[in-house]
Design a protein with these regions (language model features):
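Short amphipathic alpha-helix that is part of the acyltransferase structural core
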Residues: 1-28, 145
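Conserved beta-strand in the GNAT
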Residues: 42, 48-57, 61-64, 69
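Conserved acetyl-CoA pyrophosphate-binding loop and the N-cap/start of the following alpha-helix
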Residues: 74, 78-86
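Active-site beta-strand termini and strand-to-loop segments that position acidic
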Residues: 44-46, 135-137
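Small/polar loops that bind or transfer phosphate-bearing groups
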Residues: 5, 66, 106-107
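Active-site rim helix/loop that mediates acceptor-substrate recognition in acyltransferases
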Residues: 18-40, 45
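Conserved active-site alpha-helix within GNAT-family acetyltransferase domains
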Residues: 93-134
Length: 145
């Protein structure tokens, strides 16, 4: 198994992204997202892309996992764990000594067990609220009277 950083192109991203059931409407949207990504990690087995993770963040206090996918037939083989490890090592390599930073994500229901096994904690707790998100759609064909 090999992991490469910052080698992901839109076509590979789309292949992996859709392999886990996610939908993207526009290749141009993916290209822009990749251009503005802090770091990209791609896992290969026998020169075949089998997993990826994209990292967003400010490089100082907060990092965010987005687009974490492993092709279903390769799940359960340690690829996700390897990618999480690579992400953590990358973050440690760019932050100053003694800094603490947050690594955050929104999990699917099916992914909660995996993330807990890899050291993540659920946000919903006594002293903090749940993680939240909102989808925003630009509707250019909207006619208003």
């Amino acid at each position: 198994m090999k992991v490469f950083i910052n080698t992901l192109i839109a076509d590979l991203f789309l292949k992996l992204y859709t392999s886990v059931g996610w939908i993207v409407s526009y290749k141009e949207q993916v290209e822009r997202a990749l251009e503005n990504t802090l770091a990209l990690f791609m896992a290969y087995e026998d020169d075949k892309p089998v997993g990826m993770v994209r990292i967003l963040g400010d490089s100082g206090m907060s990092f965010y996992i987005k687009g974490f996918a492993v092709i279903p037939k390769y799940q359960g083989k340690g690829i996700g764990k390897l990618l999480i490890s690579e992400v953590q090592n990358y973050i440690l390599s760019i932050i100053d000594k003694d800094w603490s930073v947050s690594l955050e994500l929104i999990s699917t229901k099916e992914g909660v067990k995996f993330y807990k096994k890899n050291g993540f904690e659920e946000r919903l707790c006594e002293w903090d609220g749940p993680g939240m998100f909102k989808m925003i759609k630009n509707i250019s064909n909207l006619i208003s009277d």
